[in-house]
Amino acid sequence: MKQIGLISPNFSEDTLVDVYKILPEGIHVEGRNLDVARYIDSEFHRVEQTFADVVRELTRQPLDFLMITGELFLSYKGPGSDRQILASVSEITSVPASTVLTAVVQACRALNMRRVVMASPFPEDQDLRLSRFLAHDEIEVVAHRCLGYNNSKVIWELSPETGYELVSSLLSENPGVDGVYMPCNKWRITSVIERMEKDFGKPVVTNTQAWVLEALRGMGMAQPIPGFGRLLQ
């Protein structure tokens, strides 16, 4: 049995439902919650103070890989902050580790997505910061549209169709982009990835897809996984 450690701003067992649909059998995810109340900088700063302790506690268990999710937490200090976080993790543990933003950048590059549209459930200011972060890694967010929510509980209740409709609107106005990026693992959009790619003819990168693939690669277990978009095929 392989084990992935997962640190997330708003971890819950419910969040793993889509993860286990994607992961091959024989892999367990052990999660820890940073407990971000709202997606604002003061909250990100607060949980940053306890982040190292969470890493230490989680990595006392036998882990094959450690993944840190939460695009907004990872990007709130600006471009390159994912690398800073990974550097701090490497001082605590020898467990191979990555972040969801590192994984998203790798996923976009793998699909030749240099010019993208971003559909998100987040507030406008957080989308703009995330766009600047991606630009630092040479991924241009040509246009973005957001739903404006700063609370994971509200986002969790959103229908997958909210993602589909947002992407449809963005691509109708920006048909020349290379693909679509959709952040947030609390936005339950995994079930509509294939339909969006089929209907709109563009590859789609989401939070969950990207970090799962990154973790599988890190454990030497990458394999084609049908049903969840081109990235995993």
Residue spans of the language-model regions?
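N-terminal glycine-rich anion-binding loop in soluble enzyme alpha/beta folds
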Residues: 1-56, 124-128, 132-159
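Short, well-structured alpha-helical segments in soluble
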Residues: 48-61, 165-177
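Glycine/small-residue-rich loop that forms an oxyanion/phosphate-binding "nest" at active or ligand-binding sites
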Residues: 55-102
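Periplasmic-binding protein-like
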Residues: 64-69, 117-118, 177-184
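Conserved beta-alpha
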Residues: 89-152, 232-233
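Short, flexible loop segments at boundaries between secondary-structure elements
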Residues: 149-152, 200, 204-224
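Hydrophobic alpha-helical
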Residues: 164-196, 206, 211-212
